[in-house]
Amino acid sequence: MEILKYPNEILDKKTKKVKNPLDAEVQKLIKDIKETMEKSDGAGLAAPQVGESLRICVIQYGGEVFAMINPKITSYSREKETHEEGCLSFPGQFLPIKRSVKIKVRYIDESGKEIKKKAEGLLSRIMQHEIDHLDGIVFIKRK
């Protein structure tokens, strides 16, 4: 799969909710996103970055690679930190971005199970960045 580079109109659009997470096409898309992300040495990759307007993203953190289907951040900490971020759709660009240190997120995993997770630090930042992609927000709009 090819990673779309900005500007591309799909990167500015809110994605559609996945109706059936266990659908064969959805499962294949997740597998393809994982492979593309790993080849690109990314920490995360969202479906719109590969041309699919669906609420799916894949995260690589702490030796684990997992998909989030229809993720929703249910709470943000008031405490925020600014750190440099990059994005596979913006090769070579790194910008200081302010984000919440901790979040709570709800999503469906690849097996169709609903997950509620608390994240902080780098994992929280990666999740916020990827979920932004699903909402049509690219990181340069956060600076």
Predicted segments, located by residue:
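Positively charged
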Residues: M1-K143
